[in-house]
C-alpha cells in the first residue's frame, strides 16, 4: 500500500512539472505576482478580514498594498522570489503562483551586497517613492490601526529562529491563483525552500508561519515539526523541517 501511494505521489509531481515551470522571478514578474496574490489573499483572514476590512469598496487598493511589499522585498538580497508559470492557449507564459522565501541567519547576511555596490541604492529609493505615493494615495481598504498586523506577527516569531534553527530558509509568503489550487503548484513553491535547505546541509532548516488549516499542506512539503504558535485572532503555527 505504501509503495502504491509513493508511486501515485511521484506521478503527481511529474504531472505538475510537465504542466508548470518553476523558476526564479524576474523584475518583469512583479505585477503578475501581485495580481496572483491579490486574487489568492483577497478573502484571507489576515490580509483580507483583519488588515483590509474595506476591500470590497476599494479592491484595487489591496493589489497596490501587495505590490508595494513585493517591490521592496524583491530588492532585499536575503529574499528570493520564486514563480510557477504555465502557458495559456496563445502560448504566452502566465504566472499562476509565487513564493517569497527569505534566508535567515548568517547565511542571509552573507547575501547582502557590499556597501559600495550601486544596487544598494535601489531599495531605499523604492521605499521613499512608495512612502510619498502612499501619502498621496492612501490605502482606503485598510484598517490603519492594523496595517502592520502581519509585520508584527512575524517580528513576534523571531524567537523561533534561534539555536539549531538560526540558519533557515523561511517561507515568508506563498500564494496560488484559485484556478490553479489543488494542482501541485503550491507544493512546487513550498518544496523549493525545503530543497535549498537540504542542499546547504544539516545546519540549515526550512520553516513557515501558517494557519492551523494549512498544517497538512505544508506537512506534505516536509515542514512537519511544530515549534510554536500564536493564539487568538489571526493566530497560527510555526512549522519547521526539524
Model regions: which residues?
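Conserved acetyl-CoA-binding loop-helix of GNAT-fold acetyltransferases
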Residues: 176, 182-195
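Conserved beta-hairpin
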Residues: 76-101, 177-180
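Conserved GNAT-fold acetyl-CoA-binding loop/helix
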Residues: 44-68
